[in-house]
Amino acid sequence: MNAGAATLGIFVNDRPHALAGGATLMGLLGELGLADRRGVAAAVNGEVVPRAAWESRALAEKDRVLVIRATQGG
């Protein structure tokens, strides 16, 4: 994170998370190592964001992001 950039306080799966101002959902998921993974879904403030919109979906102070990863098991 750029030391001169403002930071946002958001929540990711109900846990506080600090993020650089101007961040997008894609940037957050990249930081979490999930941007290129299959089987990932994300919602911001209760609204599902289609994968095609991750790059353009800006995040704001106090946004609540829910990240879901599909898993297989047997």
Region spans (language model):
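Ubiquitin-like/PB1-type beta-grasp interaction modules and other compact soluble beta-rich domains
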Residues: 1-73
